[in-house]
Amino acid sequence: MKLEMICTGEEVLAGQIVDTNAAWFASTMMEHGVEIQRRVTVGDRLEDLIAVFQERSLHADVILVNGGLGPTSDDMSALAMAKAKGEPLVENVEWRERLEEWFTRNNREMPLSNLKQAMLPASAVMVDNPVGTACGFRVKLNRAWLFFTPGVPFELKHMVTEQFVPFIRDEFNLDSKVALKKLLTIGQGESALADKLEPLELPEGITIGYRSSMPHIEIKIFARGEKAIAVLPRVAGHIKMVLGTAVVAEDKATLAEEIHYKLLNSGLTLSVAESCTGGMITSQLVDFSGSSSYLQHGLVTYSNESKVRVLGVNPSTLDDHGAVSIATVEEMAKGARQILDSDYALATSGIAGPDGGTDEKPVGTVAIALATRGGVYSQMIKLPRRSRDLVRSLSAAVAYDMLRRELLAEAVIVDYQSIGRFSK
C-alpha cells in the first residue's frame, strides 16, 4: 500500500504555523507499521487543490487530506474534490441533522455558513467526526482513496484512530501483527547511537528507527510477524544494555512522563526551584493529569534576591560562588524541599545564552541539585550551546534523570557522552 498525505492551508504553506498534524500522523502510522511515502503541502487555492488531488491520485493507493473542511470561504477541500472528480456537491442530510443537533445541544443558533460543512462530493462516503462540526469523508479518484480530515488536531486524532486506521487495514488487508518498543535516550546524538546499534545482528522481522525530538532521541524497535514479536522484549533488553545510561525511559514520549508516573505511583512528593529552566520542569509535569497529588510547588527564582528571600540561599554563598554554582543550587534545592517538607526537590541555575557566559562559566554551564531527606546530590554540567531552548530543555532532562535514578535506587550522577561535567 502506498500512503501519501496532502496538507492544506495558506498558513501552513507560509510557515506561519508549524504542521504538527503531519508529524503526528507520520509517527502514528509508523507505529502501525505503515510509512508515508510522500507529503505535499498546498495553499487554499481552488485550482491548486484540484490539480494536486488529480495528480497524486494517479500514484498513491490512499491519501490522507488534512484541512479545509471548515465553514469559511477559504475552506475548499470538498469543492476541490468534487471538481477534481467532475461531480456536484450534494447535501449530506445525516450530517446537516447532526450539525443542527450539536448547536441545539450547546444552546447556540447555527450560522448559515455551517451548512457548507454538510455539502460533500456526490460520490463521497461520510466519515464520522465525533468531536467537531467538520464532516469527514472519503472519495475514490483514479487509483486512490482520498480520506478527508479536519485541521483541528484533536479532531484529526480521533478520526485517524477510530476511522482511518481500521479502514486501511480492511481495505488493503494489512498484517496487524506489528509490535513496537520505544526507548527514550538523552546525552548521545543520533549518529553515536547508530554507531553502537548498527553492528547488532537483529532477528528476522526486527528493525530499528530513530526520531530526534530534542532533548531526546527516541529509538523505535519494530517487530513484524509473530516470531519477531515473541523476541521483541529480549531484543529491547539487549539494546538497553548496549546503550547503558543513555536510555532513560521505555515506551514513554518524554522523560517528564516517566517521572510523572513514577511519582504518581510512589506516593512521594516533589518541589521544584528553577532559575535557568524558568518553570519548564514544573510545566512539563503539570501537563499530566494527577500531578497535583505529588507536585507541591514550583518556584521560578530567577533573581538573586528571590533565591535569598524565597529559598533562603545565604547571600554570602552568592557572593563567594555566584548564582551558577554547586553551592548555590544545593541551597536552592534544600530550601525548596524544606518549605513544604517534600520528599524531593530539584533545583537548576545556569547560563542558557546566547549572552552571559564567561571563560570560567561559558554559555551552557548549568548547576543542578536534587535534595532528598537523606542529603543532596549535585553536579555542574557543560551543555552544547546550540540554542537557548536546547540548554534549558537538556537541563530539565538531566534534572529529571537524577530524580529517576534516585527513585530506582541507582547512581544519581552518571556520564552522558555529549554532556560534560565540571569537577566540584
From Swiss-Prot:
| Highest rank taxon of the organism | Bacteria
SUPFAM superfamilies of this UniProt entry? Answer: CinA-like, Molybdenum cofactor biosynthesis proteins
InterPro entries, A to Z:
CinA (IPR050101), CinA-like_C (IPR036653), CinA_C (IPR008136), Competence-induced_CinA (IPR008135), MoaB/Mog-like_dom_sf (IPR036425), MoaB/Mog_dom (IPR001453)
What the record says about family reads: Belongs to the CinA family.
What protein name applies here?
CinA-like protein
Q: Which organism is it from?
A: Shewanella baltica (strain OS155 / ATCC BAA-1091)
